[in-house]
Amino acid sequence: MQILFVASEVGPWSKTGGLGDVAGALPQALAERGNEVAVVTPRHGSIDPHAAGLQPVRTALHVRGEPVALWVKRGPAPVYFVEHPHLFGSRRGLYGEGGRDHGDNAERFAFLTRAALALPAALGLRPRILHLNDWQCGLGPWLLRHEHARDPALAGARTVFTIHNLAYQGLFPKQVLPALGLPWEVFRWEAMEFFDQLSFMKAGLAFADALTTVSPTYAREILTPEGGASLDALLRHRARDLHGILNGIDVHAWDPARDPHLPAHFGAGDLTGKAACKAALQREVGLPVRPEVPVAGLVTRLAEQKGIDLVAAALPALLARDVQVVLLGSGDAAYEQAFARAAREHPDRVAARIGFDEGLAHRIEAGADLFLMPSRFEPCGLNQMYSLRYGTVPVVRAVGGLADTVEDFDGFARGTGFRFSEYTPQALLTATRRALDVFRDRRAWRGLVERGMAEDNSWERSAARYEALYRTLAPGR
């Protein structure tokens, strides 16, 4: 089956979060299953074509009469990079700079989507599925119906629109409609109008043939007023078309038996290397090397969506136990300062690294005993799956993908982690104390570790589910 996959970021070339991870991995997994997949994304200013090994493509690609240059990264699922010197090439941030969105994001991502829809005719492709991701590509289903209705390259193509985070809705003043080349008729409540603004997210939800999101639990949560970000009524109307498909992880990049970022390697059958990773992590972050003390790790954005307010509130009581905490992350300045202060006040118990370091993120996953993810909401989450693979027991709030990937320990021989429901510091503290108590029971803890490491969270599993959905939309193709 031919699939055109469109995303505003694609790892490893451009990434601000989970969307980049998905766009970098899912098309490759689909290609490995025998599908013909092409990926379309902007050539952001941060991407050096020559350093990235991109090749120019000679093609007659035009968007609203304007010629568009194209680059490609060859591979099983080739990635096409759309060039626009002003809209993308001259920008540092993918969506904004200095904490503010780019003022022309509506024009930027309307351009990307139009370029993606024009690409099949220019390259001789005949995709049966257009897989469009998040608000940046939300205009795609409407544009397919109204601007490409007679395009033979897209005849019969069906659209899949994936919600990676419903909180980001692509909201713009209605006055941008003429600049986008959209008629005023789309500015209706049953189309793209959202509280007197234009919503790219709502456009995708209203016009795509099928909707997906990144975990089954999140798919249920967004149907409710509490989780639906004021789009729950539309989503309930389209509930039969909504599918929750859990994200996967890159099991090659995240493999404790081969990870180049680790000082020692290990697997479920021999955890000696994990003990060595723990000692090395303690040394690296300046904590006393004490193998008997549980290490709790966090690799997170310091924002309330991630539950960091719960961690900050629970930390003093948590430190009453004999435990070490290692945090890596950046975000809200108040939380950066709070954890830096905690590290100064408890230098033998708390280590805080403000910023991001890919290698250290891997070493925390490998060296910690437990991993805290108390998110307020979490569409899917990746770190809990990394933790399971690395034998690090997750303590999570039972929301979104966290609820789908971590089974609560039953006190005997079932479960892969520890879950809590209430969004309170006390609930986090209670779950973490449960984990610390079980840590002292080496046999029970070993069972938790081994069950977690046996979980299959690969992209192969997720790709099979997407492929099944595609075939219901375009059978026999």
UniProtKB/Swiss-Prot annotation:
The gene is glgA. This is Glycogen synthase. It is an enzyme of class 2 (transferase). It comes from Anaeromyxobacter dehalogenans (strain 2CP-1 / ATCC BAA-258). Pfam families: Glyco_transf_5, Glycos_transf_1. PANTHER family: ALPHA AMYLASE DOMAIN-CONTAINING PROTEIN, GRANULE-BOUND STARCH SYNTHASE 1, CHLOROPLASTIC/AMYLOPLASTIC. GO terms for molecular function: alpha-1,4-glucan glucosyltransferase (ADP-glucose donor) activity; alpha-1,4-glucan glucosyltransferase (UDP-glucose donor) activity. One of its GO terms (biological process) is glycogen biosynthetic process. HAMAP family: Glycogen_synth. One of its GO terms (cellular component) is cytosol. Its EC number is 2.4.1.21. It catalyses: [(1->4)-alpha-D-glucosyl](n) + ADP-alpha-D-glucose = [(1->4)-alpha-D-glucosyl](n+1) + ADP + H(+). ADP-alpha-D-glucose binds at residue 15. Synthesizes alpha-1,4-glucan chains using ADP-glucose. Keywords: Glycogen biosynthesis, Glycosyltransferase, Transferase.
